[in-house]
UniProtKB/Swiss-Prot annotation:
Protein name stated in the entry: Deoxyribonuclease-2-alpha
Entry annotation: catalytic residues: H295
Organism: Homo sapiens
Subcellular location: Lysosome
Role: Hydrolyzes DNA under acidic conditions with a preference for double-stranded DNA. Plays a major role in the clearance of nucleic acids generated through apoptosis, hence preventing autoinflammation. Necessary for proper fetal development and for definitive erythropoiesis in fetal liver and bone marrow, where it degrades nuclear DNA expelled from erythroid precursor cells.
Disulfide bridge positions per record: C19-C159, C267-C347, C308-C327
Tissues in which the UniProt entry reports expression: Expressed in monocytes/macrophages (at protein level).
Gene designation per UniProt: DNASE2
Catalyzed reaction equations: Endonucleolytic cleavage to nucleoside 3'-phosphates and 3'-phosphooligonucleotide end-products
GO MF, any single term: DNA binding
Positions of glycan attachment: N86, N212, N266, N290
Length: 360
């Protein structure tokens, strides 16, 4: 255990703002899968506060060491710098199409269907990509909390630690996804170094083709991620209209099924995009649950090596909205996610047609 802990500490530069794992130590990346309510045993499970935890050295999914509403868990600990009294040396963007404190004057439905946090200092920081409505609370709240509205259903949160320079690329991606930024701090050197982020907080977006963008991001420890972002004028499903062909693989997609205009599994192209219907964690205790109980958004290639975690569903309305996903070919990530697919909607026998050529 001690060598593993030392290795984790050495992988992330000292002084950099990073994701913190369930162990309380810096990690390069982690995934938290908040379980639906009523799945599992005990009062916490009944209230929908339990989660599964994954990072590169966790050996697969583990039970969360805290509850999702605790500041001692991976998510709460990572976000703690937001809620300290002195944040003058930080920059942050909190964005959510369902913000914690919506105003009648706001119309976030015109923005991208996208949720996340950018938090950084002068050495680096992290990108938290998630599916959670009304989250996280603004910095002015001075305390981490989990919204009651996000307890019932499953949710995913992917945190990746990045060097300072990588945030300029993220700024470009957000001009495509067109997020609703409900809380931010971007001053001095941060505004100078990241003009795209400044444009994002001002409500600007891309104004000419192409209406989609993919970029390579390299984490603090050197892990390679691929960010995919589309603007509303892209006018197609993220997964069947772009991602499957760009990655060159079939995809099994988990998304929120309680929306209008759900797109069926798509087998009309070279690469199949299959809707996941049921999720099951390994082991006799599971748990297992249906996609109608799960608000998370992720996809996995059935035979590897790709896994993506993002913020978009497969429905007709979101073909006309911005959003994206963050993908990687990390063995630990794929080996954890691929077995979760217990059942999916099969193809309907539609004839295949030649695929458009996409490059990553």
């Amino acid at each position: 255990m001690i060598p593993l802990l030392l290795a984790a500490l050495l992988c992330v530069p000292a002084g950099a703002l990073t994701c913190y794992g369930d162990s309380g130590q810096p990690v390069d990346w982690f995934v938290v899968y908040k379980l639906p309510a009523l799945r599992g045993s005990g009062e916490a499970a009944q209230r929908g506060l339990q989660y599964k935890y994954l990072d590169e050295s966790s050996g697969g999914w583990r039970d969360g060491r805290a509850l999702i509403n605790s500041p001692e868990g991976a998510v709460g600990r990572s976000l703690q710098p937001l809620y300290r009294s002195n944040t003058s040396q930080l920059a942050f963007l909190l964005y959510n199409d369902q913000p914690p404190q919506p105003s009648k004057a706001q119309d976030s439905s015109m923005r991208g269907h996208t949720k996340g946090v950018l938090l950084l200092d002068h050495d680096g920081g992290f990108w938290l990509v998630h599916s959670v409505p009304n989250f996280p609370p603004p910095a002015s709240s001075a305390a981490y909390s989990w919204p009651h509205s996000a307890c019932t259903y499953g949710q995913t949160l992917l945190c990746v630690s990045f060097p300072f320079a990588q945030f300029s690329k993220m700024g470009k991606q957000l001009t495509y996804t067109y997020p609703w930024v409900y809380n931010y701090q971007l001053e001095g050197i941060f505004a100078q170094e990241f003009p795209d982020l400044e444009n994002v907080v001002k409500g600007h977006h891309v104004s000419q083709e192409p209406w989609n963008s993919s970029i390579t991001l390299t984490s603090q420890a050197g892990a390679v991620f691929q960010s995919f972002a589309k603007f509303s004028k892209f006018g197609d499903d993220l997964y069947s209209g772009w991602l499957a062909a760009a990655l060159g693989t079939n995809l099994q997609v988990q998304f929120w099924h309680k929306t209008v205009g759900i797109l069926p599994s798509n087998c009309s192209d070279i690469w199949q995009v299959l809707n996941v219907n049921q999720i099951a964690f390994p082991g006799p205790a599971g748990p297992s649950f249906n996609s109608t109980e799960d608000h998370s958004k992720w996809c996995v290639s059935p035979k590897g090596p790709w896994t993506c975690v993002g913020d978009m569903n497969r429905n007709q309305g979101e073909e006309q909205r911005g959003g994206g996903t963050l993908c990687a070919q990390l063995p630990a990530l794929w080996k954890a996610f691929q077995p979760l697919v217990k059942n999916y909607q099969p193809c309907n026998g539609m004839a295949r047609k030649p695929s458009r050529a996409y490059k990553i």
